[in-house]
């Protein structure tokens, strides 16, 4: 970084190396005015995922968020899809520093996405994150898929720690997909949460359809759905491979995430850590008087 006093400008450049050296993103931060020699502390943003530290999605997400604050990436050292909120309880977890640059650190973790968040808060960051962001996941986490999601497992862990948290996912399995069409929406949502925070015990599950241009954004609820035919025999006798067929149980419900994705819109679903079914509690009051 350098200070150009004649033009009263502070400029800082950070390089983000994408997986396998495919491309480099350079972001410059400029501060103008009479106090240009002084830069206020930028918000700290914790970044995680469940596809692993080398996934394209987390590299793209990091570049999108860099203009908004200092970034601490702590992500699994390999794919952890379907990890949900699981954590490592039977063996030690290894944390490795991969990169340290102005405004950016990157660590890999041998554990789950939940482990990554726990370790980051206790052994990586030196101040409390203003925001935690997970993704961008290769594959949507809409409808019931949110319950299996390691992407959202990391988000829920941060939310339980009182940190505003967002999960971003893309409806695709293409490991080399283009995340550019979603950049503006990611930064707009992240900026809004940084400024206004979120209600207590509430986080956001954001999903994108794979389109060249979004048709809009819909704040909605998760659709009811189910999986069937989930296991098929593998080559070795007695072993099985996860597969499955998803069915949306309310495909015509326009207030759901699945409908929004089917119609080219981003879906934003507020999730909460309190899983109490308060609407059903009264119907079960009879249990209190059972003999």
Residue ranges and their predicted role:
Residues 4-7, 15-24, 29-31:
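Short terminal hydrophobic/aromatic SLiMs and anchors at protein ends
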Residues 40-41, 45-48, 56-123, 127-128:
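A cross-family phosphate/adenosyl-ligand binding-site feature
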Residues 131:
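Short, Asp-centered acidic motifs that coordinate Mg2+ and/or phosphate
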Residues 140-149:
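Glycine/threonine-rich flexible loop motifs
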Residues 154-158:
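Hydrophobic/aromatic ligand-binding patch that stacks against planar heteroaromatic rings
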Residues 159-181:
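Glycine-rich phosphate/pyrophosphate-binding loops
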Residues 179-291:
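Electrostatically charged, flexible surface regions
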């Amino acid at each position: 970084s350098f200070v150009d006093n004649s033009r009263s400008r502070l400029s800082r450049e950070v390089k983000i190396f994408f997986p396998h050296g495919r491309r480099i993103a350079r972001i410059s931060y400029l501060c103008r005015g009479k106090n240009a020699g002084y830069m206020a502390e930028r918000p700290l943003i914790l970044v995680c995922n469940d596809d692993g530290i080398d996934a394209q999605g987390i590299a793209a997400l990091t570049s999108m968020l860099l203009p908004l604050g200092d970034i601490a990436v702590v992500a699994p050292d390999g794919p952890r899809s379907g990890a949900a909120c699981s954590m490592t309880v039977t063996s030690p977890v290894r944390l490795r520093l991969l990169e340290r640059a102005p405004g950016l650190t990157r660590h890999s973790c041998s554990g789950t996405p939940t482990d990554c968040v726990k370790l980051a808060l206790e052994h990586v960051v030196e101040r409390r994150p203003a925001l935690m962001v997970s993704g961008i996941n290769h594959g949507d986490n809409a409808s019931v898929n949110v319950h299996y999601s390691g992407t959202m497992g990391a988000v829920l862990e941060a939310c339980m720690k009182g940190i505003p948290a967002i999960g971003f996912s893309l409806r695709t399995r293409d490991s080399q997909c283009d995340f550019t069409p979603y950049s503006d929406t990611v930064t707009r949502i992240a900026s809004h949460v940084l400024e206004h925070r979120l209600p207590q015990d509430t986080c956001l599950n954001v999903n994108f359809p794979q389109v060249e241009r979004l048709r809009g954004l819909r704040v909605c609820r998760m659709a009811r759905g189910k999986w069937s035919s989930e296991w098929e025999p593998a080559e070795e006798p007695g072993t099985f491979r996860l597969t499955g067929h998803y069915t949306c149980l309310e495909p015509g419900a326009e207030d759901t995430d699945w409908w929004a994705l089917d119609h080219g819109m981003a879906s934003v679903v507020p999730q909460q850590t309190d899983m109490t079914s308060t609407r059903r509690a009264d119907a079960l009051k009879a249990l209190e008087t059972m003999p």
